[in-house]
Curated annotation (Swiss-Prot):
Transcription repressor. Required for the specification of corticospinal motor neurons and other subcerebral projection neurons. May play a role in layer and neuronal subtype-specific patterning of subcortical projections and axonal fasciculation. Controls the development of dendritic arborization and spines of large layer V pyramidal neurons. May be involved in innate immunity. One of its GO terms (biological process) is regulation of gene expression. PANTHER family: ZINC FINGER PROTEIN (PTHR24394), ZINC FINGER PROTEIN 771 (PTHR24394:SF48). The lineage of its organism: Eukaryota, Metazoa, Chordata, Craniata, Vertebrata. The keyword Mitochondrion does not apply. Residues 1-22 are annotated as: Disordered. A zinc finger (C2H2-type) spans 277-299, 305-327, 333-355, 361-383, 389-411, 417-440. This is Fez family zinc finger protein 2. GO terms for cellular component: nucleus. Pfam families: zf-C2H2, zf-C2H2_6.
Length: 459
């Protein structure tokens, strides 16, 4: 058989028992020429089936060709959009603004074509650009007057973050329009520049649909720093009514302040409930049984948490954790004025009071001030006349236990602090410094200062 000949297939004759006549040969609907041809026959243009858009009364079905690349063959309706509670536009204005790119088109069933009209607010001279909001005349558009070949898509809503005085975040909505470009957002027309970091312009340019102020929580912005609605040409385009938001925020702040103030009152807790856990020894009241349990070692003297390095005991585990830093010899917190280093930042803050001359703790009896609360409490014992710490050798009494500890060095001849000039030993570093100021500092510049002294331990 030649290659140019048409392919033919012979159907075998029917069984003679069936009583059928012999079958004739049939030519197929395709050939080798058509298969090897470079060009294909054009497809017939798409013609929708008549009545496809109409509901079938018997079956109640519609032709929804949503996934087809061809135009959607369903009646065009405005898409539903749920507007937030504090949006700047009503639904009607939002719907009209979504039509600003295509116009109102002719009347009837799509007689005006697809988007042949002018923008909604093109005749307005007050607006910076075609925002679709400031048109004076109401534009009444019926669903039948919409263009026949265009899908109505709701306007994109962006979110920006504002930080009122209370520190809580408010999300303001504004239309994705060029009426307020990103440069005006960054220059403080909508939000103060204090909320923006150095990388904000690049982030806004890269992601214009999502602009999140990451440093909003860290910026303590007051209520008076918020922009006022007066400088805006369109008050309805503000990112929410700021006065109302700030008013609600002020009420919330006052309510929270009232709860905090109530917790500071005697006999009140953070949740407003009275404290009903009382210490039987000193009469101190607590709002939780756990706090009372932590308080009881003050009277019993129990120190269950013991340091494994030095053997010192503590009433609480947190105090033991802070104590362990002493044995690590790490002092990351340094004073900028004298260069002295400390283990904890709280100790550095207390040390800074010495340079500032700030003594917040003042004795009620003699008026002497102290930088630290511990020194203030120890000083008050001198006015009470009570000396409960006594030496077992000479029966000398002391107000504080560390004074007794240093006193015991006089009996065992331990003087760990030695003067580098004269070699005299002292039990306390305080006594050594006083010795140097009194005798050696007035001799001349060659005399060593307290910083040149070394501490030696004598057996």
């Amino acid at each position: 058989m030649a290659s140019s000949a048409s392919l033919e297939t012979m159907v075998p004759p029917a069984c003679p028992r069936a009583g059928a006549s012999p079958a004739t040969s049939k030519t197929l609907a395709f050939s080798i020429e058509r298969i090897m041809a470079k060009t294909s026959e054009p497809r017939a243009p798409f013609e929708p089936r008549p009545g496809a858009l109409e509901a079938d009364g018997s079956q109640g079905k519609k032709l929804l060709n949503l996934c087809s690349p061809l135009p959607c063959m369903i009646p065009l309706q405005p898409l539903g959009y749920e507007v937030p509670s504090k949006t700047l536009l009503s639904y009607s204005e939002l719907w009209k603004s979504s039509l600003r790119a295509g116009g109102g088109g002719g009347g009837g069933g799509g007689g005006g074509g697809g988007g042949g009209g002018a923008p909604v607010c093109g005749a307005s001279g007050l607006c910076k650009t075609n925002c679709g909001v400031c048109c004076k005349a109401e534009l009444g558009l019926a669903p039948s007057a919409l263009p026949a070949g265009r899908v109505i898509k709701p306007q994109v809503i962006n979110q920006a973050v504002g930080l009122p005085a209370s520190g809580s975040l408010y999300y303001f909505n504004y239309l994705d329009s060029t009426a307020y470009p990103p440069s005006e957002l960054l220059s403080g027309h909508l939000f103060p520049s204090g909320l923006l970091n150095a990388q904000a312009p690049a982030a806004l340019a890269a992601h214009p649909k999502l602009f999140l102020l990451e440093n909003a929580k860290l910026a303590g912005l007051a209520a008076d720093k918020f922009p006022h609605p007066a400088p805006y040409p369109h008050k309805e385009r503000l990112p929410a009514p700021l006065e109302q938001v700030l008013k609600e925020n002020s009420a919330l702040t006052a309510e929270r302040g009232g709860v905090k103030g109530h917790s500071k009152l005697p006999g009140g807790s953070a949740d407003g409930k009275p404290k009903n856990f009382t210490c039987e020894v000193c009469g101190k009241v607590f709002n939780a049984h756990y706090n009372l349990t932590r308080h009881m070692p003050v009277h019993t003297g129990a120190r269950p948490f013991v340091c494994k390095v030095c053997g010192k005991g503590f009433r609480q585990a947190s105090t033991l954790c802070r104590h362990k830093i002493i044995h690590t010899q790490e002092k990351p917190h340094k004073c900028n004025q004298c260069g002295k280093a400390f283990n904890r930042s709280s100790t550095l803050n207390t040390h800074i009071r010495i340079h500032a001359g700030y003594k917040p703790f003042v004795c009620e009896f003699c008026g002497k001030g102290f930088h630290q609360k511990g020194n203030y409490k120890n000083h008050k014992l001198t006015h009470s006349g009570e000396k409960q710490y006594k030496c077992t050798i000479c029966n000398k009494a002391f107000h504080q236990v560390y004074n007794l500890t240093f006193h015991m060095h006089t009996h065992n001849d331990k003087k760990p602090f030695t003067c580098a000039t004269c070699g005299k030993g002292f039990c306390r570093n305080f006594d050594l410094k006083k010795h140097v100021r009194k005798l050696h500092d007035s001799v001349g510049p060659a005399a060593p200062s307290a910083k040149d002294l070394t501490r030696t331990v004598q057996s």
